[in-house]
């Protein structure tokens, strides 16, 4: 039994992730478990999951399940293919699909985190392959060129400045 005291976020990258012996989530599912939720996790044949711990306040109570493989969950924002995952006053999390030579640009006053689910990004001479994690602090400009077909990113913004403020309050 897993207890998600501070809340967790999971993205199934491969295999099948099972919850409570009855709910199977294949690759592409996004799961958001609120503060103090309980569930039993397993996988019959194994699963690779991207997990972020301590992602929610005790005030967030909604469990979220999104199949990111379902086209109905994707929208076009300008020239961007976006799968919104979660949005609040202090967080915006989404997946973004990009084409080769496309530029991923994000100007975030509050910081940004990027996980490369598939494909590859490049910034100058630096190459970021699948599985790379990029965190830019508040007031930094994200500007990356897409190098490969089928590049998909997990992107989280609007949260780092708020997290830093909470950290400072707790440590004062």
Predicted regions and their residues:
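Glycine-centered loop/turn motifs
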Residues: 22, 26-28, 101, 126, ...
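Histidine-centered metal-chelating micro-motifs
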Residues: 3, 18, 30-41, 103-104, ...
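A short, N-terminal "cap"/entry segment at the start of jelly-roll beta-barrel domains
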Residues: 46-90, 94, 169-172
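Short, structured motif recognition centered on aromatic/hydrophobic residues
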Residues: 10-17, 25, 29-32, 49, ...
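Ligand-binding loop in jelly-roll beta-barrel domains
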Residues: 22-24, 35-60, 127, 138-167
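Surface-exposed interaction/gating patches
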Residues: 73-123
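Glycine- and acidic-residue-biased ligand/ion/polar-headgroup-sensing regions
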Residues: 1-20, 108-124, 130
């Amino acid at each position: 039994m897993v207890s998600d005291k501070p809340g967790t976020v999971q993205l199934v990258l491969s295999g099948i992730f099972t919850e409570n012996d009855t709910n199977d989530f294949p690759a592409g599912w996004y799961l958001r478990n609120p503060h103090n939720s309980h569930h039993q996790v397993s996988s019959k044949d194994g699963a690779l999951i991207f997990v972020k711990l301590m992602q929610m306040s005790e005030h967030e109570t909604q469990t979220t399940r999104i199949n990111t493989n379902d086209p109905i969950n994707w929208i076009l924002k300008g020239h961007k293919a976006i799968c919104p995952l979660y949005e609040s006053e202090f967080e915006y999390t989404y997946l973004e699909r990009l084409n080769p030579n496309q530029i991923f640009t994000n100007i975030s006053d509050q910081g940004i985190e990027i996980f490369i689910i598939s494909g590859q990004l490049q910034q100058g001479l630096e190459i970021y392959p699948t599985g790379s994690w990029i965190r830019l602090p508040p007031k930094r400009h994200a500007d990356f060129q897409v190098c490969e077909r089928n590049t998909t990113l997990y992107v989280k913004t609007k949260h780092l400045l708020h997290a830093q403020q909470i950290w400072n309050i707790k440590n004062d």
